[in-house]
């Protein structure tokens, strides 16, 4: 509807975060820089390939098209939006309205002249075949999944694995309905070790605890919450304390076996934590391979959003990079 054409805030508190200077908006990358980042018409029209249909790629494709370029957006899966719907499910029932992001970007793509090609994996041969003037790579970087003993056990879950498992249910039921259904059944064990206490790990710990799971959250350093805006981040650990979530700092998982997860502390010592399942929630890490491949056949190439890894994988930077 008409509301989807408006960049509605999601109550994420990014624009209020004193840590982020200059201030930025998660869904409005032009906040405070409206003149500098206005989509001005280009002097020379180009044919542009945008690789990756997540928030950064969708924002980039729309902006380039608005400026007058001929844009084709490529996504290797069957749907645009990246992991937005999965994030909306995890945050369902809270204060954030994550689906505003998906609805707005989808509406903008539909209104634009951007050509969308789903289920299309971009390789060097395709780029040479299409012969674009420029390529923008906005595809996800790989998540860090350390090769420890037991990492391939069937009761170990990674972010890419959970994203894939959730694709069909999310399409069938939507984030809110699926979140409600998960309160009655979620296909993991009762006792869970979550490895990684950044934004993904902390929010996963809250989601799972609300579904009656016993949680041990393993932080590789002293920080819990990562790049979650300060307004919400400062509330996380008090909630964990009240809810009975155990936080283990300065530790890593050395092995995962039948008895549970073997933690190894940075100051020395080990602890075996009995558990039924382990979730690996470590952050993305930059892998230049895709960009290097995409850049080789063309004169102009850029990498944005999740391709850069680290902070750029998160929506605020993804939108800004896409702009």
List the predicted regions and their residue ranges:
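Beta1-alpha1 glycine-rich phosphate/pyrophosphate-binding loop at the start
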Residues: 50-119, 191, 197-231, 246, ...
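Short, hinge-like loop/turn segments at secondary-structure boundaries
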Residues: 89-93, 154, 233-236, 320-321
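A Rossmann-like FAD-binding core segment of flavoenzymes
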Residues: 98-145, 153, 158-161, 169-190, ...
């Amino acid at each position: 509807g008409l509301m989807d054409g408006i960049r509605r805030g999601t109550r994420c508190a990014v624009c209020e975060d004193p840590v982020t200077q200059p201030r930025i908006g998660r869904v409005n990358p032009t906040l405070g820089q409206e003149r500098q980042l206005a989509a001005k018409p280009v002097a020379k029209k180009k044919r542009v390939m945008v690789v990756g249909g997540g928030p950064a790629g969708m924002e980039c494709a729309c902006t380039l098209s608005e400026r007058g370029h001929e844009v084709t957006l490529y996504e290797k899966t069957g749907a645009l939006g990246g992991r937005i719907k999965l994030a909306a499910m995890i945050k369902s029932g809270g204060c954030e309205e994550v689906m505003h992001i998906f609805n707005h970007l989808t509406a903008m793509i539909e209104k634009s002249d951007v050509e969308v090609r789903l289920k299309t994996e971009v390789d060097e041969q395709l780029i040479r075949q299409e012969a674009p003037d420029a390529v923008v790579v906005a595809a996800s970087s790989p998540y860090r999944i350390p090769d420890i003993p037991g990492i391939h056990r069937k009761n170990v879950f990674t972010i890419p694995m959970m994203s894939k498992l959730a694709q069909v249910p999310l399409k069938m039921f939507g984030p809110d309905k699926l979140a409600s259904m998960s309160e009655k059944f979620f296909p993991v064990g009762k006792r869970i070790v979550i490895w990684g206490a950044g934004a993904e790990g902390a929010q996963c710990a809250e989601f799972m605890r609300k579904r009656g799971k016993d949680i041990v959250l393993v932080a590789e350093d002293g920080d819990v919450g990562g790049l979650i805006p300060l307004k919400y981040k400062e509330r996380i650990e008090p909630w964990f304390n009240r809810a009975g979530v155990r936080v283990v700092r300065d530790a890593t998982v050395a092995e995962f076996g039948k008895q549970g997860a073997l933690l190894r502390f940075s100051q020395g010592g080990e602890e075996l934590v009995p558990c039924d399942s382990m979730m690996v929630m470590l952050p993305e890490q930059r892998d230049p391979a895709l960009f290097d491949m995409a850049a080789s056949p063309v004169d102009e190439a850029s990498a944005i959003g999740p391709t850069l890894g680290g902070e750029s994988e998160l929506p605020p930077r993804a939108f800004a990079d896409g702009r």
